[in-house]
Amino acid sequence: YDKNLNSEVQKVLDDNFGEENYDIGHLFAYASNGGNGDAGYVGSVCQNGTKGGAFSAHSFQGTTTDPFLNDHFDIDYVTHEMGHQFGAFHTFSFRNEFEGFNSEPGSGSTIMGYAGIVGFDNVQRHSDPYFHYHSIHNINQYIDNKSCYLSVVNENQIPTVSADRDYTLPVGTAYELEATATDPDGDTIYYCWEQLDSGQVDAANFGPYNHLGAQARSLPPSLSPIRTTPQMEAVLEGNLTIENPQTGGQWETVSLVDRTMTWAVTARDRYPASEGALGRMAFDIKVLKIISDAGPFKVTSQNQEGILWEAGSKQTLTWEVAQTDQAPINTKFVSVLLSTDGGETFGTALLSSTANDGEEVITVPGGISSEKVRIKIVPDNSIYFAVNSNDIEITPAPFVLTFDRYDQEACQEQVTFAFDFEIFSDTDQSVSLSFSELPSVLSAQFSESQLTDADLSGTVNISGFENLPAQDMILTLRAEGQTLTRSIDLEVKIREDDFQEIQLLTPANTEQEQSRTVSLSWTALQNADQYKVEVSESETFSSFTLSKTIDSSSTVLAGLDFST
């Protein structure tokens, strides 16, 4: 041994076996000074003069208090160096090798990373036993350009996988990546989501302000097609961003700056290896554009400790819309979900497709007794989401009365509210319904005014609104049982079809020499809930440069042409 194992191993193999008699050579060696390995070249299989020059060596003793396992040698060294021989580049990013594949933060954690040997930049102490998306494609590309291999028929069929469409997301906001896959053989599929953006990212510069490189580590394949970024544990703790991560730490962050992120999903069918049948894989790509014009999207209510809700009570939820309702994200509607297991699952829908306006009132569902309740708000058109930051406790109630809607618009003589009634007590419950201080000109008719059945649906019909002027009014319904009395506010917006002429307040009518940004305001009408604003360069309004519907009696027009 002349201190150059690469050249000596190559020579020994060629001299003793003949270079025409092997495709890859690799020496397993003992090293008294710990572990090391060297493939000699990236891409040497079937290359005469280099295909036998790789080695892996180790003292087979642990460098920490952890017991050393031969598996660590097999994965961290042998498989890593063989990966190089088959054309795979490094995937770590604690330093940049400018090949376009440094996509794992710090040391990385897959086979072609340097897990456990780069000090403060270590993601973890040893490699996980799988190849990164980049490594698989490096190897496939290398093999495809070689002819020394023997082709065999693989009876196992390739699965198909979809990463879904690309998305534009708000900054500072968690998101979920979800794949769908099928296997023609019915094999079990394992999913692995990995970020593909290359660039130097070590522990010192890892964080939410990077425009390039990795912001999320690779995680081992799992049966779940969903990857939450950051992981749900961090989201529930409110740790969406992290800087200077430690070994064994999070190594995942959302972005607080504009950037583009490319993700890949690898679907492995884990087919049991046998002669003529080996496991197969499929891949797909997803691109995320993060924009600072929107976000962070976050829940702003139920974030303090010690919150107690009673089943059947009405609670107000608030969230920061943060321009997510505007282009290019365009989330007009969101859904509100509830978890009773501390955020592991969100199996109860509180609201579906409600307006993304930052505030909603929900009725706490019955049949729940939990100290680990969380609220999750998800857009109907995207993959980002927000969760409140503290557990809520829900205590049971003997009965729950909920309405499909708690507000109605009365343009006619009467309105109807539909309700559902449930009993959650072991004792007999009889609940009577009545209104508190109903105006004398109004009358209420209940389909069921005495509720005794455990589960029933009914209606409340209120008439006489033609006797009242246009206004918004609150009617308080009392549901009185043996052990609980609950008051429920129902809002009625009384409207007439008598619309007065709108008077422009600012700017003055026919006033000229306005700036390109104009503040419009006009007299508010009692019977109007919305107004349509149209801007045209034509006196006949035959075409429009702007047309929008708003809820208030003022708006700002920005970026107008000088000729408008």
Briefly describe each language-model feature range.
Residues F333-V334, A528-T545:
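Extracellular low-complexity, O-glycosylation-prone stalks/linkers
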Residues T173-A181, Q315-T318, V415-D420, T517-W522:
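A short beta-strand segment in extracellular, disulfide-stabilized domains
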Residues G249, G358-E360, V518, I550-V556:
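Short S/T/G- and acidic-enriched coil/turn segments that sit immediately N-terminal to beta-strands
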Residues P159, Y190, F206-V361, G366-D498:
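Long beta-sheet-rich domains in secretory-pathway and surface-associated proteins
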